[in-house]
Structures are given as structure tokens and as C-alpha cells.
UniProtKB/Swiss-Prot annotation:
GO terms for cellular component: cytosol. Homodimer. Keywords: Cytoplasm, Decarboxylase, Lyase, Porphyrin biosynthesis. It catalyses: uroporphyrinogen III + 4 H(+) = coproporphyrinogen III + 4 CO2. Substrate binds at residues 27-31, 46, 76, 152, 207, 321. It is an enzyme of class 4 (lyase). This is Uroporphyrinogen decarboxylase. It comes from Staphylococcus aureus (strain MRSA252). The gene is hemE. The lineage of its organism: Bacteria, Bacillati, Bacillota, Bacilli, Bacillales.
Length: 345
């Protein structure tokens, strides 16, 4: 076990005094790291996530290299879907491809439930390796949100307009709600197992929910999100972060959820979120494209985010989306160091 652990991110969420604004980066573990790219010459994503020693190594790298205040488990949001009967393949340059998309209620009924100890022991073993050995910051576990998982399962892969997903919602509510309920059950078990293995925070990625308007979110998604988060919190008092992209119109709906942290993409500033009435700890939200700019531009864009965060008093610095593969590791190291220095109390 680690002594003198850096719990800055947990203190920030609890409203306790911190020495600086905590920082971590979505997709910090993986594609921007030379060590990871070398591994990918030999192993696929699923190969790495199925080998706890390799997965723990990749998860730990950014903490060592960038001095982040949290680690996020290296895995894919598709991980819990394979065991329940989803034939998923990660294709380079495309993303997840589903070979047996959901079309009918019978397709939903064919899905099995997840038993994390039996079906994803490698995920739990990775967490145990990290938390029982030398990780000196909290570990973030995660899951995809029901809508985002369902959209992949219905569309058969990434989509620009989610026509098949919306068509199912509007045309076949029975199938839609059956799928939502099944995915909530899977997610609760999956997330709970991660916490029991040692994860100290959970992030829910609802990457594509911005495709819905407020009315549809309230009818088709919100009750299921409330159930998912509430059932996890009934079992363990773990902080929950929610993040989505292009969904500023849903901010007030998210603020109603029993989450602890609301992640902002780069389109909505911290001040704007406050003006909209958000009361949660805020996470974000540098445009990841800025990391490809010269350092003077990066610093110029960092300062207002950090100033607004310090004024708000409850802020975790992050990007407004994941790290691009083209970002230089030294840039991430400099950003992390700048956040720590600039916000030092």
C-alpha cells in the first residue's frame, strides 16, 4: 500500500482544501505515449486489456510521465459488451464495429447478464495490481453510458446522425426500454465490481448523447441514468463523473443527476456552466486541439480556464475531449506542471 498518497482530486470533489487544482487527461493512458505505441506494434487493444500486467503498465505511465493527480484505467467502453453476447471488433481508423446489431426485442432477450468476476477478471485483476502496489493517486474506473453503448449496438458502429437509434426510440419503445434496462443492469454490476476491486472514482462516458434534444433525453435516457448512478451509490459512496460531447443543452438535466462531477467539453466555459445553474464540481475543459499549438498559445488558453476554476472553487482540470495521438508527451507534461504551479495555494 502507498503512504502519503496524493488524494487532491478526492479532496476537491469533497470540497476540502487542496494545495492545487487537480489535473488528469481523458485518454492520457495510451495513444500519445511512445511506450504505448511500441506495445501496439505487438499487441492489439484487447490483447493489452486482457493482460493485467500490461494494462497496469499502460494505466500507470501517465502518472509517472505527466504527474497527473489521477490514473484512469486503460480499457475500452466496449469491454463489458463482449461477455453479454455482443460481437464487437475494434477496427483501426473506424472504432468499434458490431457484427450482430440490435434490431428487435428478441435480440435484446438474447443478451446475457454480466458476472464481472467470471467475465472480466482481467479488468479487476488490473485494478487490484494498481491499487495494491505503488499507484500513488486515485484510480478512475469507467463505463460507457447506456445511450452511448446502445447507439453502437443498434447502429453497428460509429454514426453521424444515429438514425437507427432514434428510430428505435420513437417506433419501438418496448425494445428501447428493454435495452436500456439491460444495459443499466450490466453497468451497475460492472462499475460496482471496479469499485470493489479498488477504483476510487467512476467516470461515465456519454459521448454521443448530444444527438438528443432535451425532451427526448428526459423521456428516453434520464430515468435510466438516475437508476444507474443511484444503484451504484447505494452500494458504495463513490464519486461519479459524467462526461459528454456537444451536449451543453443538456447541462441542467445532468445537474439534476446524482453525480458529483460534471465534465464540460471545450464549447462551454466554466463561467457559462455556473450561469446555467450548475452546482456540481466542474471538470475540463481545454480544447484538445490547442495542445498542437505553440506553448505560448497553450498557456494563453490555460489561464482563463484555471482562473475560472479557482473562482468557482470546485474544479478538476482536464481537456474537453480525449488526447489526440499527435500530441507530444512533453506538452502534456508541461500542461500538468503549469496547472500545478499556476493554481498553487
Amino acid at each position: 500500500m502507498v503512504h502519503n498518497k496524493n488524494n487532491t482530486i478526492l479532496k476537491m470533489i469533497k470540497g476540502e482544501e487542496t494545495t492545487h487544482t487537480p489535473v488528469w487527461f481523458m485518454r492520457q493512458a495510451g495513444r500519445s505515449q511512445p511506450e504505448y505505441r511500441k506495445l501496439k506494434e505487438k499487441y492489439s487493444l484487447f490483447d493489452i486489456t486482457h493482460q493485467p500486467e500490461l494494462c497496469a503498465y499502460v494505466t500507470h505511465l501517465p502518472v509517472d510521465n505527466y504527474h497527473t493527480d489521477a490514473a484512469i484505467l486503460y480499457k475500452d467502453i466496449m469491454t463489458p459488451l463482449k461477455p453479454i453476447g455482443v460481437d464487437v471488433e475494434i477496427k483501426s481508423g473506424i472504432g468499434p464495429v458490431i457484427h450482430n446489431p440490435i434490431k428487435t426485442i428478441q435480440d435484446v432477450e438474447k443478451l446475457s447478464q454480466i458476472d464481472p468476476e467470471r467475465d472480466v477478471p482481467y479488468v479487476l485483476d488490473t485494478i487490484k495490481l494498481l491499487t495494491e502496489e505503488k499507484l500513488n493517486v486515485p484510480l478512475i474506473g469507467f463505463t460507457g453510458a447506456p445511450f452511448t453503448l446502445a447507439s453502437y449496438m443498434i447502429e453497428g458502429g460509429p454514426s453521424k446522425n444515429y438514425n437507427f437509434t432514434k428510430a428505435m426510440m420513437y417506433r419501438d419503445e418496448a425494445t428501447w426500454f428493454a435495452l436500456m434496462n439491460h444495459l443499466v443492469d450490466v453497468s451497475v454490476k460492472y462499475v460496482t465490481a471496479q469499485v470493489e476491486a479498488g477504483a476510487e472514482l467512476i467516470q461515465i462516458f456519454d459521448s454521443w448523447v448530444g444527438a438528443l434534444n432535451v425532451e427526448d433525453y428526459r423521456r428516453y435516457i434520464k430515468p435510466h441514468m438516475i437508476r444507474l448512478i443511484s444503484e451504484v451509490k447505494e452500494k458504495h459512496d463513490v464519486p461519479v463523473i459524467l462526461f459528454g460531447v456537444g451536449a451543453s443543452h443538456l447541462i441542467n438535466e445532468w445537474n439534476d443527476l446524482p453525480i458529483d462531477v460534471l465534465g464540460l467539453d471545450w464549447r462551454t466555459s466554466i463561467n457559462q456552466a455556473q450561469q446555467l445553474g450548475v452546482t456540481k464540481t466542474l471538470q475540463g475543459n481545454l480544447d484538445p486541439s490547442i495542445l498542437l499549438a505553440p506553448w505560448n498559445v497553450i498557456e494563453e488558453r490555460l489561464k482563463p480556464i484555471l482562473d475560472q476554476g479557482m473562482e468557482n472553487g470546485k474544479h478538476i482540470f482536464n481537456l474537453g475531449h480525449g488526447v489526440f495521438p499527435e500530441v507530444q508527451p512533453e506538452t502534456l507534461r508541461k500542461v500538468s506542471g503549469f496547472v500545478h504551479t499556476y493554481t498553487q495555494r
